[in-house]
C-alpha cells in the first residue's frame, strides 16, 4: 500500500462538496446481484449444513423420560416467567398480584409522556427513562432470582 494523502478540510471546494453531501463513497461492489444471489445463499446453506451436522454428530436427548407417577415438589415456569411467578407467589391476595402485573406495562407506557424530549436524544439526557429502565431491570433480576429459591428466602435472596 502506498501513502494516502489525507484530505484538507480547510479547502473551500471540499467543504462545499461535503456540505452538499457529496463526500460519501458511492462506488464499490453492488449488492445486487453479487450479494443477494451468490453470497447470501452460501451463508444460509452453510448455516443449515452446520446445524444438520451438529444434530447428526452430537444428538442430545430432549430430557429425561417422563414418569407419570412422580410429580416434582415444586413446578417452576420457564425462566422468562420467573419475575411474574415471584409476584404471584409472594403477594397473598391474587387480585393484588394480577393488578401488580398489569401495573408494569401501564407504568412503562406512561414513561414517554413524563419527559418532553426528542426521542432520538442520548439516553443519559433522559434521566426519568434511564432511571425507570435501570430500576426495572434490577427489580426484574431480583424477582427472577428469587423465584428460583424457596419461598422463605425468595424476597431476601437468602442474604439476610
Swiss-Prot record:
Superkingdom of the organism of origin: Eukaryota
Matching CDD domains: cytochrome_b_C (cd00290)
UniProt entry keywords in alphabetical sequence: Chloroplast, Electron transport, Membrane, Photosynthesis, Plastid, Thylakoid, Transmembrane, Transmembrane helix, Transport
Subcellular location: Plastid, Chloroplast thylakoid membrane
Molecular function in Gene Ontology: electron transporter, transferring electrons within cytochrome b6/f complex of photosystem II activity; electron transporter, transferring electrons within the cyclic electron transport pathway of photosynthesis activity; oxidoreductase activity
GO cellular component: chloroplast thylakoid membrane; plastid
Family, as annotated: Belongs to the cytochrome b family. PetD subfamily.
Subunit details: The 4 large subunits of the cytochrome b6-f complex are cytochrome b6, subunit IV (17 kDa polypeptide, petD), cytochrome f and the Rieske protein, while the 4 small subunits are petG, petL, petM and petN. The complex functions as a dimer.
Role noted for this protein: Component of the cytochrome b6-f complex, which mediates electron transfer between photosystem II (PSII) and photosystem I (PSI), cyclic electron flow around PSI, and state transitions.
NCBIfam families reported for this sequence: cytb6_f_IV
Protein name (record): Cytochrome b6-f complex subunit 4
Source organism per UniProt: Oryza nivara
Amino acid at each position: 500500500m502506498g501513502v494516502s494523502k489525507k484530505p484538507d478540510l480547510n479547502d473551500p471546494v471540499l467543504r462545499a462538496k461535503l456540505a452538499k453531501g457529496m463526500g460519501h463513497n458511492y462506488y464499490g461492489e453492488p449488492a445486487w446481484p453479487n450479494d443477494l444471489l451468490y453470497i447470501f445463499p452460501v451463508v444460509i446453506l452453510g448455516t443449515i449444513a452446520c446445524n444438520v451436522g451438529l444434530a447428526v454428530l452430537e444428538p442430545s436427548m430432549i430430557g429425561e423420560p417422563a414418569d407419570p407417577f412422580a410429580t416434582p415438589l415444586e413446578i417452576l415456569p420457564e425462566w422468562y416467567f420467573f419475575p411474574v411467578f415471584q409476584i404471584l407467589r409472594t403477594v397473598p391476595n391474587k387480585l393484588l398480584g394480577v393488578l401488580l402485573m398489569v401495573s408494569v406495562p401501564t407504568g412503562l407506557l406512561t414513561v414517554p409522556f413524563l419527559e418532553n424530549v426528542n426521542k432520538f436524544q442520548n439516553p443519559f439526557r433522559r434521566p426519568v427513562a434511564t432511571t425507570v429502565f435501570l430500576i426495572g431491570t434490577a427489580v426484574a433480576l431480583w424477582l427472577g432470582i428469587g423465584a428460583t429459591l424457596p419461598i422463605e428466602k425468595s424476597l431476601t435472596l437468602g442474604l439476610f
